[in-house]
């Protein structure tokens, strides 16, 4: 499913499962220009890890929108008690990797020619992640 497809976004909005997928949208003149999502597995060996995915229209890149959406989702993940967040990229998504690095993510893994794009061209798979630390000042406050 292509996250830039308006029908995919519409389906997500109509079937929101906030306990496992939290989407944040950026709108301009009533049009979705960016979407970021925090995905969480409620069971299994990755239940403590959230995954952030993002898509932003090229015209709206380099304007600070993506960084604000990602930072908001990192904060939500921390408040939800997740211990880590991760993000997946292909090698040519260098701008996204740089943004996530600026926000505190580190490169965890790179698998050469592991994934294919929509045109069946092989790319390196890149996994970035961040450990979420609880602010000691607020720990234990309910």
Predicted region positions:
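Amphipathic alpha-helical recognition patches that constitute DNA-binding helices
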Residues: 51, 95, 102
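Conserved acetyl-CoA pyrophosphate-binding loop and the N-cap/start of the following alpha-helix
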Residues: 60, 64-72
């Amino acid at each position: 499913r292509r996250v830039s497809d308006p029908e995919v976004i519409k389906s997500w909005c109509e079937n929101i499962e906030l306990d496992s997928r939290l989407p944040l949208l950026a709108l301009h003149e009533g049009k979705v220009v960016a979407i970021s999502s925090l995905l969480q597995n409620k069971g299994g060996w990755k239940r403590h890890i959230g995954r952030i995915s993002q898509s932003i229209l090229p015209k709206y890149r380099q304007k600070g929108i993506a960084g604000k959406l990602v930072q908001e989702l990192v904060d939500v993940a921390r408040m939800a008690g997740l211990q880590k967040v991760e993000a997946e990229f292909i090698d040519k998504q260098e701008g996204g990797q740089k943004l996530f690095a600026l926000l505190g993510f580190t490169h965890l893994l790179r698998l050469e020619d592991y994934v294919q794009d929509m045109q069946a061209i092989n790319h390196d798979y890149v996994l970035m992640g961040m450990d979420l630390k609880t602010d000691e000042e607020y720990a234990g406050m309910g």
